[in-house]
Amino acid sequence: MPTTVSEEIAGYQLTLETGELAKQANGAVKVQYGNTVVLVTATASKEPKDDLNFFPLTVDYEERLYAVGKIPGGFIKREGKPTEKATLTARLTDRPIRPLFPDGFRNPVHIVSTVLSVDQNCPPEIASIIGASAALSISDIPFDGPIASVKVGKVNDEIVVTPDVDEHEESQLDLVVAGTKDAIMMVEAEANELPEDEMLEAIMKAHEEIKKIITMQEQLVEQVGQKKMEVELDLPSDELVSEVEELALEDIEKVLQIKDKLEREDAMDEAKQKVVDHLLEKYNSEENEDEEEELKEKHIKSAFDSILKREMRSRIIHENSRPDGRGQKEIRPVTCDVDLLPNTHGSGLFTRGQTQVLNVCTLGALGDVQILDGLDIEESKRYMHHYNFPPYSVGEAGFMKGPGRREIGHGALAERALKPMIPTEKDFPYTIRLVSEVLESNGSTSMGSVCASSLSLMDAGVPIEKAVSGIAMGLIKEGDQLAILSDIQGIEDFLGDMDFKVAGTEDGITALQMDIKISGTTREILKQALKQGKDGYLHILNIMKQTISEPREELSPLAPRVIKKQIDPDKIRNVIGPGGKMINKIIDETGVKIDIEPDGLIYISSSDAEQAEQAIKAIDELIKEPEVGEVYLGKVVRTEKYGAFVEILPGKEGLVHISELAEDRVGKTEDVAKVGDEILVKIINIDERGRINLSRKQALGEEDGKTNNDDKKSTKKT
């Protein structure tokens, strides 16, 4: 018998149901929001993975195209690898729940969100987050939830929770917030230059709705919640931590005074290994088993890291001393460069401390858009950003492979940051691809990608509205004391309480991503972080403007030129031709790319201006309307007893009656006009059905012999 709880949230009915589907999972909840239905399951292994030093959580978001009544495109008619949207939603589900598992929990946990039905007004990614929390909360898996999530927009200066499709199109904000009853855990936002106070207001409004959904989950737990399993947490003992502290504290204090990342990491590894060797030798002398020694080594390293974290945080809070010697608001040295690569359309290099990103911009025809075969209404996108993070960027030897979840996520964040500034298709009819190559990494390569992308776009001559920059912020909180750090580096990100990335222009925020690992993050803390973040990215923006302050007036000479031509929508079929015959002929003969919009707007893309002009002339011929009295050099395509059919324009034929072939009487059509001959003809009549009547004898009587298709060359004098 299923158990359900239901409540109206932002105008749509939200129902959580368990007990009917997927009953062998540790926890399973069917979430229905409006007509969106997502089944979320949570399973956990009974035994821990002893060889791991991290929590093995896997989140999979499974899109099913039947959810929107579609059959997958392509040769194989089933879903393949996850789409980019599915990967991003899996990350969105993972991020707010991961901090709520116990430290030292090493049992593999698997969350699977399967999308069964999609109502475009009620986003399935929100149902996935709610379902993951609910499934974990009612299961026997240790979890310090529940959490919930909502999507928020801003339409006509009003904050709207769960905006519908039409409102989403008009919204100045696309915000996803997740949190517990007491605190915000995650924020993901794209905005059209939203002020910080309005962003904060939207986050707080979202939290009010989140509390209602958490109450629903608590009701479900009261009815069907299981007793949590007893697990042994894989943590070093207090005695071991004390022993490691005694051996390592002095070295850790020295390590934290080293400003260079690589030098500091080498010293840290050396100090850690010294403690490991000392303690393993001690335990070896006590004749411990090998397996216990390996386990102990992991615990020794964990104890060392906990002391390192404590000492670094203490130095920041009490001494205002960061690992590289900067103040809390101080940003590392920034340098910028553009036009680095000779054969690309645009390039930008952004370096901030030991983080360096090269971005390359490529422009293409509208036909180069990325086709999307997913659950959203959007079927293609003309602006995309790809992010690559090779092992050498952190000084490691590794394997080069396809983009992982992290790379897809970082690329999407940088893409969102610049999206509000990208010109519309009408104003700039190009496909835009940006690729960020991370060359060095020591904190916030995603925000480095935003800055490098902005430089690259302006170098390519893309008329972006304004330049965009970004910065990563951090938070260290100990009791009532806190430090908000600008431009965090890798070690501060790893050991801090908040990862907070913000991008924007001089006039407001364009993207925001926040992950908070602790409770008690107040409105005032978020307000201070947003203000300090804006100060930081504006500082970087001013440095970028010293290199290039606005888009170049001309596109790169290597970029294709796009010419727009408006025609009557009723003439589109003339340009395309039967089975695409006419348009493909133009493309084959001129080498251009042609894209046609339903409203009759044609885009001709070519790197060769002469070829583009040839294509335009060919299109003009296809859409030209013949008029009575005009003379053409036509081609005989068919002969009958009563006359000859002559093509005067591509796809347009007329009849020369046998009596109109010559002044003298003609006994047989072929005596004057054979198939393939080119002859002069004049339009003498177009009847009410559009049929064209031609005359050869009247055309021959024209004095100047000028035709309306002079560019055609005759193969036979007539």
Curated annotation (Swiss-Prot):
What is its subcellular localisation?
Cytoplasm
GO MF annotations, alphabetized: 3'-5'-RNA exonuclease activity; magnesium ion binding; polyribonucleotide nucleotidyltransferase activity; RNA binding
| A cellular-component GO term for this protein | cytosol
Q: Where is the S1 motif domain?
A: 629-697
Q: Where is the composition biased (Basic and acidic residues)?
A: 699-718
Cofactor(s) needed? Mg(2+)
For this protein, the record's Pfam families field holds:
KH_1 (PF00013), PNPase (PF03726), RNase_PH (PF01138), RNase_PH_C (PF03725), S1 (PF00575)
Listed A to Z, the keywords are:
Cytoplasm, Magnesium, Metal-binding, Nucleotidyltransferase, RNA-binding, Transferase
One biological process term in Gene Ontology: RNA processing
Task: Name the positions where Mg(2+) binds.
Answer: D493, D499
Q: Which EC class heads this enzyme's classification? A: transferase
Chief location category: cytoplasm
Disordered: region residues? 695-718
EC numbers for this chain: 2.7.7.8
Matches recorded under SMART domains: KH (SM00322), S1 (SM00316)
Which parts of the sequence belong to the KH domain? 560-619
Q: What chemistry does it catalyse, as a reaction equation?
A: RNA(n+1) + phosphate = RNA(n) + a ribonucleoside 5'-diphosphate
Stated role: Involved in mRNA degradation. Catalyzes the phosphorolysis of single-stranded polyribonucleotides processively in the 3'- to 5'-direction.
Q: Which HAMAP family match?
A: PNPase (MF_01595)
Supply the NCBIfam families for this chain.
Answer: polynuc_phos, PRK11824.1
Tell me its family: Belongs to the polyribonucleotide nucleotidyltransferase family.
Name of the protein in question: Polyribonucleotide nucleotidyltransferase
* Organism whose genome encodes this protein: Natranaerobius thermophilus (strain ATCC BAA-1301 / DSM 18059 / JW/NM-WN-LF)
